[in-house]
């Protein structure tokens, strides 16, 4: 077994300068490894085979599920000693309605910013704080 969150080292030959072409290659051989190519293919497969509902909410939710299939989880892909690649945020935008949706690594709840609730003719920059603290809905 050679699976690891660390980048693999060339153990083939000292005379051949083999280098990893992508982060996450310590998982090569593991079904669904974390290399860029594998993640791209998995994202394409998931997008092309997923089923979405007909509402805006269902489509947005499905989008985040699709990208969740390829997100980077802290600890699985080491980029430097003690530092790991993570999916910092995921976002999509409904250009017809002017709504920007996002989640962050630390807050999985989907946040929406409706651009049409702002004065789009204003010369002032409008900014919102990124909601990056886990937001758990307490049901009872």
Regions picked out by a protein language model, each given a short descriptive name:
Residues 1-140:
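C-terminus-biased signal that marks the final domain/tail of proteins
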């Amino acid at each position: 077994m050679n699976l690891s969150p660390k980048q693999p080292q060339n153990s083939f030959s000292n005379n051949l300068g083999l280098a990893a072409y992508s982060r996450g290659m310590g998982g090569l051989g593991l079904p669904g490894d974390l290399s860029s190519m594998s993640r791209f293919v998995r994202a394409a497969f998931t997008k092309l085979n997923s089923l979405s509902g007909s509402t805006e909410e269902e489509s947005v939710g499905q989008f985040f599920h699709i990208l969740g299939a390829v997100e980077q989880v802290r600890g699985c892909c080491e980029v430097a000693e003690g530092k790991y690649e993570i999916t910092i945020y995921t976002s999509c935008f409904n250009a017809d309605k002017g709504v920007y949706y996002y989640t962050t690594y630390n807050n999985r709840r989907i946040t929406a910013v409706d651009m049409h609730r702002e004065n789009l003719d204003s010369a002032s920059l409008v900014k919102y704080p990124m909601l990056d603290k886990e937001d758990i809905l307490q049901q009872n």
